[in-house]
From Swiss-Prot:
Pathway where it operates: Sulfur metabolism; hydrogen sulfide biosynthesis; sulfite from sulfate: step 2/3
Amino-acid positions noted as binding ATP in the UniProt annotation, renumbered to this chain: 35-42
Protein name, per record: Adenylyl-sulfate kinase
UniProt family annotation: Belongs to the APS kinase family.
Pfam family, one: APS_kinase
Keyword tags: ATP-binding, Kinase, Nucleotide-binding, Phosphoprotein, Transferase
Length: 201
């Protein structure tokens, strides 16, 4: 908190997180999907959200492109702006988890320090790092937005995986092979969520 905000105090809620979770019938957590552009983060997160919705789970998906239309529309792609982008998303995701939602986030989030920042904000027991591990060559072949082509041509600077580093998670809670079928990956995720008692069997 900034020094000039010292008179701003936190007001406790009369309804607790546990009460909200009881109302929803499941825990409030953040599944943080990370991986290269084109790895399948948004696709897998979206398919998982649909599957959870069909099971009556209260969810919300925060997507890297979507938040830049509103919440982070004032930010560019400098290192400082990228860090602020992740900080803001982490704050929103934490609030949503407090509300008892299963929050799915799909962000490249290339730096371990930034992902750790969000983990500490959300809480280690509510933050689940999901690494969608897809080889760069496969991501380039997919290239759904044509970004790799632009980066290779020098038209797009500071692009993760080409001229900007991606720091892969060292010990993610969930490690997915991004070359598998999406249906298989969703099944793996649902099994893990049940095993960890986040959603009901």
């Amino acid at each position: 908190m900034a020094q000039h905000d010292e008179n701003v105090v936190w007001h406790p809620h009369p309804v607790t997180v546990a009460q909200r979770e009881q109302l929803h019938g499941h825990r409030g957590v953040v599944l943080w999907f990370t991986g290269l552009s084109g790895s399948g983060k948004s696709t897998v997160a979206g398919a998982l959200e649909e599957a959870l919705y069909q099971q009556g789970v209260s969810t919300y998906l925060l997507d890297g492109d979507n938040v830049r239309h509103g919440l982070c529309s004032d930010l560019g792609f400098s290192d400082d702006d990228r860090k602020e982008n992740i900080r803001r998303v982490g704050e929103v995701a934490s609030l949503m988890a407090d509300a008892g939602l299963v929050v799915l986030t799909a962000f490249i989030s290339p730096h371990r320090a930034e992902r750790q920042m969000v983990r500490e904000r959300v809480g280690h027991d509510r933050f689940i790092e999901v690494f969608v591990d897809t080889p760069l060559a496969i991501c380039e072949t997919r290239d759904p937005k044509g970004l790799y082509k632009k980066a290779r041509a020098g038209e797009l600077k500071n692009f993760t995986g080409i001229d900007a580093v991606y720091e892969a998670p060292e010990s993610p809670q969930i490690h997915l092979d991004g070359q598998q079928l999406v249906t298989n990956l969703v099944s793996q995720l649902l099994d893990l969520l049940r095993q960890d008692d986040i959603i009901r069997s």
